[in-house]
């Protein structure tokens, strides 16, 4: 598709799901999507994550899911959510040059602050990777993975829930 249109990116508009049961700590949903392939120059520190949802998953841990489409959040602060529940739709808001999901776990209920917490994904399929020239490279050793965290540049797929 046209790399200058957010809507032409495969991930754009995809459902963003809760990765664990928890309570919504905060929601930002009013920031604009940025044009793809252009680094934004007019956003402040508070807008770096763009539209986002922060989940309190207990034990002092918070999940930050960022770069959602404006107005797409389906939850509000204080809502209880369950793993797999739709939180919003993937967009290109904040400090980003193309639609993608920013996800991290930290010990603070604020965007991009606090100590990061290591985590693993319970199951996914490793498909390949993206090389330095942004080309897809299949495998090697493509297939199912459990309790791992994909490396940077990995292309993965999530199988349907059993």
List each language-model region with its residue ranges.
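Short, small/polar residue-rich loop motifs at catalytic or cofactor-binding pockets
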Residues: 10-12, 49, 73-74
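Short histidine-centered loop motifs in beta-beta connectors
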Residues: 17, 61-84
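A structural signal for short beta-strand/turn segments enriched in small hydrophobics and glycine
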Residues: 22-24, 78-90
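Zn2+-dependent peptidoglycan hydrolase active-site motif and core
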Residues: 23-69
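Short, charged beta-turn/beta-strand-edge "cap" motif at the junction between a beta-strand
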Residues: 30-32, 87-95
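Acidic, glycine-rich catalytic/binding loops that coordinate metals and/or anionic ligands
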Residues: 43-47, 74, 79, 104-162
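Histidine-centered catalytic micro-motifs
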Residues: 68-69, 98-108
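Short glycine/proline-centered loop/turn elements that form peptide/ligand docking sites
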Residues: 74-76, 92-99
């Amino acid at each position: 598709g046209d790399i200058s249109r957010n809507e032409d990116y495969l991930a754009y508009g995809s459902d963003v799901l809760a990765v664990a049961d928890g309570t919504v700590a905060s929601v930002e949903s009013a920031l604009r999507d940025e044009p793809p392939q252009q680094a934004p120059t007019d956003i402040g520190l508070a807008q770096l994550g763009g539209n986002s949802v922060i989940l309190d998953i207990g034990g002092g841990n918070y999940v930050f899911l960022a770069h959602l489409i404006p107005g797409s959040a389906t939850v509000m602060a204080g809502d209880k959510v369950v793993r797999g529940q739709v939180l919003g739709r993937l967009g290109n808001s904040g400090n980003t040059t193309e639609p993608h999901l920013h996800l991290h776990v930290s010990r603070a209920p604020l965007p991009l602050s606090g100590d990061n917490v290591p985590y693993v994904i319970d199951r996914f399929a490793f498909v390949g990777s993206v090389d330095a020239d942004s080309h897809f490279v299949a495998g090697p050793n493509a297939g199912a993975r459990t309790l791992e965290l994909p490396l940077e540049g990995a292309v993965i797929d999530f199988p349907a829930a059993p």
